[in-house]
C-alpha cells in the first residue's frame, strides 16, 4: 500500500505552522496510541503513520525536502538505520510527547518483539510528454535516483570482516520503555533507532548506512490516452525496505506539454480556426489539422466569429474510453490589416452597398444596436 501524503495524514494544510502540526499530531497520537487500543491493528498502523508524518514535517530540513520531492526527498534511512547514522526520527517523538503518554496511558502492550521493520519510501518521477505521445502511448526509459544496498557491506553497514552487534541499550528489541511514576511508555530505541543492532566499525563505503545513492534505469509503458496529472504505479521500484521491510513503489506522474494548436478537455480537443473574412462571408472548404492528419470542413456563407464546428471522433480515446472524443474548432474571423489605398477604396464601395441593403446584411449588428438603445432608454 502506497504511503499517503504526510499533510493528509495529519489533516493539515501544506502551509500549516509548526504549532498546527504539533496540535494535529497530539490529537492523532492520543486517539490511536496502542495502549488505548490494545487489540486494534488499524489503530496501531494509524499511530505509526501519524508519527512518521510528524517526524518529517516537524523537522524544517526534512519538511523542505518533502515539499519539493515528496517521499523520495526524505532520507529513507531516517526512519531507523544502524548505529552509523547520525540521528534517527524517534527522538523527536520522545522529546515532544513522551510526557503526554506517560501521564495518560498505563503499562505498554509488550516488552520486545524484535527490530522494527519499515516499508521503503515511495518515489515520484515527473515525466513530461507531448500531446501526440499521450494520445498514442509509447514505451520509454527513465533514470530514477534511489538508495541501493551497499555493494561493499551488502547492506549490513558494517566493515568487511565485522558484523553488527546486538544493541546494548534495548537488547536487540529496537524499543525501550520509559518509566514515569506508575506509568511507562514504549519508544524507539535512541541508540539503534529501532534496528536492534549497533555498528561499532562502520563500512567505509557507505559510512555505516548500508546503502548508497545511485541511479537505476527502468522501462515504463505509457498507455494511450493518458491525461495530464495521471500517475503510473510501478510496484516495488521505490526505495528498499529497512530491516527486511518491503520496498516502496515508484509513481510516474505525467505532465503534458502545452500544444501549439490543441487544448485538451478530457477526451475532447479544442482549437481555434482562423479564417479570412471573405471566406466567412462567402463560405468555402478548408483543411483543419487533427492529431491523425488533416480533415476537410465546410464553412457556410455568413459564418460568424465564435461559431463552433464539431468533428466527431477526432479527439483522443481515453485510457478507459471505448470511443475517441471529438474535435471542436472555434471560428475566429480575421480582419485584414495593412491595406493599400486601392483595397480601402474597394472596401468602402462594398460598405456602401451593404448600407443600401439595410439590416438584412448585418442581423447581429442590428440586434446589438437595439440592445444598446434599450439599455440607455
Curated annotation (Swiss-Prot):
Its cofactor is Zn(2+). One of its GO terms (cellular component) is cytoplasm. A zinc finger (CR-type) spans 137-215. It is found in: Cytoplasm. Zn(2+) 2 binds at residues 167, 170, 189, 192. InterPro entries: DnaJ, DnaJ_C, DnaJ_domain, DnaJ_domain_CS, HSP40/DnaJ_pept-bd, HSP_DnaJ_Cys-rich_dom, HSP_DnaJ_Cys-rich_dom_sf, J_dom_sf. Zn(2+) 1 binds at residues 150, 153, 203, 206. GO terms for molecular function: ATP binding; heat shock protein binding; unfolded protein binding; zinc ion binding. Binds 2 Zn(2+) ions per monomer. Residues 5-70 form the J domain. Signal peptide: none annotated. GO terms for biological process: chaperone cofactor-dependent protein refolding; DNA replication; protein refolding; response to heat. Keywords: Chaperone, Cytoplasm, DNA replication, Metal-binding, Repeat, Stress response, Zinc, Zinc-finger. Pfam families: DnaJ, DnaJ_C, DnaJ_CXXCXGXG. CXXCXGXG motif repeats lie at residues 150-157, 167-174, 189-196, 203-210. Homodimer. Belongs to the DnaJ family. NCBIfam families: DnaJ_bact (TIGR02349), PRK10767.1 (NF008035). Participates actively in the response to hyperosmotic and heat shock by preventing the aggregation of stress-denatured proteins and by disaggregating proteins, also in an autonomous, DnaK-independent fashion. Unfolded proteins bind initially to DnaJ; upon interaction with the DnaJ-bound protein, DnaK hydrolyzes its bound ATP, resulting in the formation of a stable complex. GrpE releases ADP from DnaK; ATP binding to DnaK triggers the release of the substrate protein, thus completing the reaction cycle. PANTHER family: CHAPERONE PROTEIN DNAJ, DNAJ HOMOLOG 1, MITOCHONDRIAL-RELATED. The J domain is necessary and sufficient to stimulate DnaK ATPase activity. Zinc center 1 plays an important role in the autonomous, DnaK-independent chaperone activity of DnaJ. Zinc center 2 is essential for interaction with DnaK and for DnaJ activity. This is Chaperone protein DnaJ. It comes from Bordetella parapertussis (strain 12822 / ATCC BAA-587 / NCTC 13253). The lineage of its organism: Bacteria, Pseudomonadati, Pseudomonadota, Betaproteobacteria, Burkholderiales.
